[in-house]
């Protein structure tokens, strides 16, 4: 099945927003929100080498461009998020037998599709104080926009619930995520795979507007890979990079190093984030 989602672009007057609420090039989620009435737009690209898809059996180099996200500040403590992408292209280097490899419907060495859209809500539960970190929760649902016929998607709906913690110590921002993921089985509609999701990131300001950042982020499948539903296995990756903020615009870049045999051996990412005033909360 093939589905497409078009994002609507919005324009308004620039204003500042909490820098801690902007993650790129990292994916570990900060508990701080972007602020009431603000809109955050981010866009960029990823290039990941030697990534493996266990459901389709494809292995190759993945280009995602653009990777986009929109966040809406619903109040001072709540934020609504939409994340996805318009074009994912996999250059296939190797094919292996897999549960859904017989469903592949493309020829040649390249296959492409859209990115699965993620719809999420983030709520800051506790504000940060000198003696206490900020705490929040995030609930996210991944929609099945990418098709299994193209070998990139799984045609499953996945749900994540995470606890978010963040603390600034002098010039260093520490953020941690921990939660549960409920992932659909692409081969059976009556089965799911439960995983433990986690992330830990560090951002250090080295001069005005400039930060160096790094993280470890992934998910852990407590069951053996042979027993777990395909596509719900353990994943993990490290990201390192930097970002520069000027007024309400931030540019970023980083490298990606996979920590399992299914993750990319190496990758790069770069993008831009813009926060502006979008609407007034009554």
Please describe what each predicted stretch is.
Residues 1-3:
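N-terminal secretory signal peptides that target proteins for export/translocation
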Residues 5-6, 279:
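Intrinsically disordered, low-complexity regulatory segments enriched
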Residues 6-16:
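Bacterial N-terminal signal peptides
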Residues 21-282:
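Transmembrane beta-barrel domains of Gram-negative outer membranes and organellar outer membranes
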